[in-house]
UniProtKB/Swiss-Prot annotation:
GO biological process: pantothenate biosynthetic process
EC number(s) reported in the record: 6.3.2.1
Pathway noted in the entry: Cofactor biosynthesis; (R)-pantothenate biosynthesis; (R)-pantothenate from (R)-pantoate and beta-alanine: step 1/1
One protein family per Pfam: Pantoate_ligase
Name of the featured protein: Pantothenate synthetase
Residues annotated to bind (R)-pantoate: 61, 155
Similarity field: Belongs to the pantothenate synthetase family.
Function: Catalyzes the condensation of pantoate with beta-alanine in an ATP-dependent reaction via a pantoyl-adenylate intermediate.
Key word RNA-binding present: no
Subcellular location: Cytoplasm
Cellular component terms per the entry's GO annotation: cytosol
Length: 283
């Protein structure tokens, strides 16, 4: 595995791989990697011949009161994990390399519709930052395919629409959420939880599953279902930010009669905000 820091080095390495007839797979990350990231890299290796991973903590997607400064930087451990997972090229740019004219002067990309509401309402500007950095990275790497985790469901919807609307020549894959044995979705932010909070956290997925089972059993009073689920989260010690039932492509509010739904949740344990989701298929 080679590690490069500049766009010039990145493009040269990818060009060499492509000249050898290799199919390029790409996994963008912010580092502090866990088994979920490793699964994405391994899956990229199954679908492509040459796997590129980026590690960049993108300031453009953090709000002024969010955890940019305390977000863990664990490059040495990340490199070891990536080597084991089968990464061929690691791109670790600086902020200056990504935004040479500064962030205030950076062209930004807004993806309408799917970026609004849910995390878009709670984190103004977040998806603009995500769409901008992903667009830049896809242009820098120019992969045949890119992989993202389904845990960040709204982010995946934003990226799919971005790629579709801008006719970017890349195939986007969403990969299933990797979970701990107790159901908690793996996340770099789980490390912020103390012992008591970590013990309470599995209530998120447990509540999603219970809500999904009720919908599959035929319950159609979505407001009442959501009220019960919010109460269950609160009783477990969580503070819900949002809990909603949506249609999975457009992310419009789900209605009885929809055959494909996704339940999305964001909830706080202390100051740590965790997200998760559950797809519900009624066919």
């Amino acid at each position: 595995m080679n590690t490069v820091k500049t766009v010039r080095e990145l493009r040269a390495a990818v060009a060499r791989a492509r000249s050898e007839g290799k199919r390029i797979g790409f996994v963008p990350t912010m580092g502090n990697l866990h088994a979920g990231h490793a699964a994405l890299v391994k899956k990229a290796g199954e679908r492509a011949d040459f796997v590129v991973v980026s590690i960049f903590v993108n300031p453009l997607q953090f709000g002024p009161s969010e955890d940019l400064d305390k977000y863990p930087r664990t490059l040495a451990a990340d490199q070891e994990r990536l080597l084991e997972a089968g990464c061929h090229l690691l791109f670790t740019p600086t902020v200056e390399e990504m935004y040479p004219d500064g962030m205030d002067g950076q062209t930004r990309i807004h993806v309408p519709g799917v970026s609004e509401g849910l995390c878009g309402a709670s984190r103004p500007g977040h998806f603009e930052g995500v769409a901008t950095v992903v667009s830049k990275l896809l242009n820098m790497v120019q992969p045949d395919l890119a992989l993202f985790g389904e845990k960040d469901f709204q982010q995946l919807a934003v990226i799919r629409k971005l790629v579709r609307d801008l006719n970017l020549p890349v195939q986007i894959f969403g990969e299933p959420t990797v979970r701990a044995a107790d159901g908690l979705a793996l996340s770099s932010r789980n490390g912020y939880l103390n012992e008591q909070q970590r013990a309470a956290a599995p209530a998120i997925y447990r509540t999603l599953r219970q809500l999904g089972e009720r919908i599959r059993a035929g319950a159609e009073d979505f407001p009442a279902l959501l009220a019960d689920a919010r109460q269950a989260l609160e009783q477990a010690g969580l503070r819900p930010d949002y809990l909603e039932i949506r249609e999975p492509i457009s992310l419009r509010p789900g209605v009885p009669g929809d055959r494909q739904l996704v339940i999305l949740v964001a909830a706080y344990l202390g100051s740590t905000r965790l997200i998760d989701n559950l797809s519900v298929h009624l066919d």
